[in-house]
Structure formats: C-alpha cells, structure tokens
C-alpha cells in the first residue's frame, strides 16, 4: 500500500511513515509508523522472531448488531482492513502463530457527532472479537475515552510510543 507521507527528518532519526484512515503498511525495514486516533482504531501488529510488523488505521462505520462480526455487515470494513494488514505481513514472511498486537483508539467525540459513543463501543467490541477469533494475543490495549491519541510504532521491535 502506498503511504500518504514519508518523513525522513524527525525525532526518531529514521524514516517515519504517517498513516491516515484506511491506510495499512507492513515492513521489515527499520523505521517508525505514526498516526493520530480518535474514533478510529490503530492496530499495531508484529512478529517478534522475524522482526517485522505493521499498522492499520480504520473505523467500523456504525453500530454493530448482536450477531457477531462474522455475519455483521457493518463489521465487514474492519475485517477487510485487518485482513489487508495480516496479508501484507504474511507476504513479507510473517507467521500468524507468532503475531502480537497492540490496539489504540475508539474514543468518542463530544463534538455533537450522533452516536459517537455507540460507534466507539462498536469499534472496541469489533477489535476484541476479531483478535479472539484469530487467536492473536493483545499485549496492550488503550481504547475508549473522550480524547485523541498520537501513536508511534517501531515495527521491528513492537514498541509503541505515545
């Protein structure tokens, strides 16, 4: 996937890829990835033995029903986003059995957006259900609340800075 912005001049002294909603990126390269999340969800995944990782930024665009993510029409965007990232990681040598995750975002907005807290809750529910179904260990979760988060991810080490 082509990344919107690549910065070579930053405090990390390595390439920094900035992701926007809908972007995903997986790499073996010694670099950083960054984004800002509000209602959207940033998922950072990495394969520690192979020192590769990736990030995706998406939002489940509505309130999910009670039938679970496999049959929920609204959850399809989240599933598609996650599978794009997982596929990219596997293409460059990742092994799903070793993948670990860190998840951020799904905050709600006090800006008058209708159903903001319900959408945030749907995003939280979606991502937890996805990782449970995929049997992927979530090492860190910082979700919900009424604030934004700035995330920097080092994909080779799986380190996240806020």
PLM feature spans:
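A generic local secondary-structure boundary/capping motif
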Residues: 22-23, 29-34, 43-45, 91, ...
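Conserved mixed alpha/beta catalytic, RNA-binding, or beta-rich assembly cores of soluble enzyme
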Residues: 30-92
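Short glycine-rich phosphate-binding loop at a beta-alpha junction
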Residues: 97-105
């Amino acid at each position: 996937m082509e990344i919107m912005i690549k910065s070579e001049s930053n405090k990390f002294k390595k390439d920094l890829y900035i992701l926007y909603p809908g972007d995903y990126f997986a790499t073996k390269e010694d670099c950083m990835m960054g984004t800002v999340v509000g209602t959207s969800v940033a998922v950072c995944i990495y394969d520690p033995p192979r020192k590769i990782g990736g990030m995706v930024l998406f939002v489940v665009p509505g309130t999910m029903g009670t039938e679970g993510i496999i049959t929920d029409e609204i959850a399809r965007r989240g599933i598609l986003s996650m599978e794009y990232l997982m596929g990219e990681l596997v293409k460059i040598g990742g092994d799903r059995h070793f993948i670990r995750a860190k998840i951020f975002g799904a905050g709600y907005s006090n800006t008058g957006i209708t159903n903001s807290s319900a959408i945030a809750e749907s995003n939280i529910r979606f991502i937890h259900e996805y990782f449970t179904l995929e049997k992927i260990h979530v090492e860190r979760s910082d979700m919900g609340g009424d604030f934004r988060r700035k995330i920097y991810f080092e994909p080779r080490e799986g380190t996240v800075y806020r």
